[in-house]
Amino acid sequence: MRRMDKVDLQLIKILSQNSRLTYRELAEMLGTTRQRVARKVDKLKKLGIIRKFTIIPNLEKLNYMYAILLIKVKATENIYQVAKVLKDHEDVKILELGVGKYNIIAHVLVPKDIKKAQEKVNDVIKEINGIEDLEVEFVSDIPKFELL
């Protein structure tokens, strides 16, 4: 993989905060040309460094919240198979694999109504085989969300 220069890193940081900026606006912020920004964005997309341009909705205003599933997969199970099942579930919006007490963390989009949220969590859990331990936490607010 090619080395990223200072402009690449600045570009990624700016886009992670506002992906709607035009190439002209980005060029002004970075002190370069629109053409150079366009080439850099294209290259970062081709390399898979920029995977998508998206928004961060206000879940509170949409009457939704996240249920965080902290999952410990049995040692006899394939963690990647469990992750694939979760990845394919339409309500799982963020999926993380890690090392520690829990080896999978899934963020499930659920209604704010706690009874409906519980039903949605149960729908996701019943699809998973090989759970050794599970904790569910509900996120009531996200005061900060930054990627870089």
Curated annotation (Swiss-Prot):
It comes from the Archaea. InterPro entries: AsnC-type_HTH_dom, Dimeric_a/b-barrel, HTH-Siroheme_Decarb, Tscrpt_reg_AsnC-like, WH-like_DNA-bd_sf, WH_DNA-bd_sf. One of its GO terms (molecular function) is sequence-specific DNA binding. Residues 4-65 form the HTH asnC-type domain. Keywords: DNA-binding, Transcription, Transcription regulation. Residues 23-42 bind DNA. SMART domains: HTH_ASNC. This is Uncharacterized HTH-type transcriptional regulator PF2053. It comes from Pyrococcus furiosus (strain ATCC 43587 / DSM 3638 / JCM 8422 / Vc1).
